[in-house]
UniProtKB/Swiss-Prot annotation:
Belongs to the eIF-6 family. PANTHER family: TRANSLATION INITIATION FACTOR 6. This is Eukaryotic translation initiation factor 6. It is found in: Cytoplasm; Nucleus, Nucleolus. Binds to the 60S ribosomal subunit and prevents its association with the 40S ribosomal subunit to form the 80S initiation complex in the cytoplasm. May also be involved in ribosome biogenesis.
Length: 245
């Protein structure tokens, strides 16, 4: 299911949060309403961690991660890093990365198996991304844009990319990622998809301006309703087993 929300009158919620299937980072200083939208969907399945990164609130643009790990820029201070580490599941690796392109969320898009990265990221950074996130890494662009994390959002089931991506490009990217992709928009026609949308394998959050048609595309390409049905089946199965006992 996809939920609409705003961060202090901004529809670019992906700037202020990072969502994976193992954790969610949200910026400090938001309204209780913003937090409650996330916590009502995610808790107790995964932790929702309130934090800043390097004293800034743009946690979604300066971090990248998946269920296996989290990468933060070298501007992340010791207190922030300690708070994040203490709040994450024990099996999630956390690492600071020295990279001149420090807006990692703009330069990297990843699911639990594959990452697409900015063509100019350091080789050492590429290796750290592969090791920490446990993914195969590919350097690429999307619709001639090097900021792949800005113009693409993926989970393990599908992905939404810049509306000007060609059919050939979609096929090539889908082959790299091994998931279906579609070109589209968020927030009533915005092509800055990474800023307006965050997803994991069962939930999505988007800006308040997102239209019903855009939400329908999101729920279909990321197969959110299928996951919801699977979760309901699992809950019914558990109840059945408990009744037998």
């Amino acid at each position: 299911m996809a939920r609409r929300c705003q961060f202090e009158n901004s529809n670019d919620i992906g700037v202020f949060c990072k969502l994976t299937s193992a954790y969610c980072l949200v910026s400090v200083g938001a309204s209780e309403n913003f937090y409650s939208v996330f916590e009502s969907e995610l808790v107790p399945h995964i932790p929702v961690i309130h934090t800043s990164i390097g004293g800034t609130r743009i946690v979604g643009r300066v971090t990248c991660g998946n269920k296996n790990g989290l990468l933060v820029p070298n501007t992340c201070n010791d207190n922030e890093l300690r708070n994040i580490r203490n709040s994450l599941p024990d099996n999630v690796r956390v690492r600071r990365i020295e990279e001149k392109l420090s807006a990692l969320g703009n330069c990297v898009v990843a699911n639990d198996y594959v990452a697409l990265i900015h063509p100019d990221l350091d080789r050492e950074s590429e290796e750290i991304i592969a090791d920490t996130l446990g993914v195969e890494v590919f350097r690429t662009t999307i619709a001639n844009n090097v900021l792949v994390g800005t113009y693409c959002v993926i989970n393990n089931r599908g992905g939404l990319v810049h509306p000007l991506a060609s059919v050939e490009e979609l096929d090539e990217l889908a082959n790299l990622l091994q998931i279906p992709l579609c070109a589209g928009t968020i927030n009533r026609g915005s092509d800055v998809i990474g800023a307006g949308l965050v997803v994991n394998d069962w939930a999505a959050f988007c800006g308040l301006d997102t239209t019903s048609t855009e939400i329908s595309v999101v729920e279909n390409i990321f197969k959110l309703n299928e996951m919801k049905d699977e979760n309901m089946d699992n809950e019914m199965r558990k109840d059945f087993v408990m009744n037998l006992e």
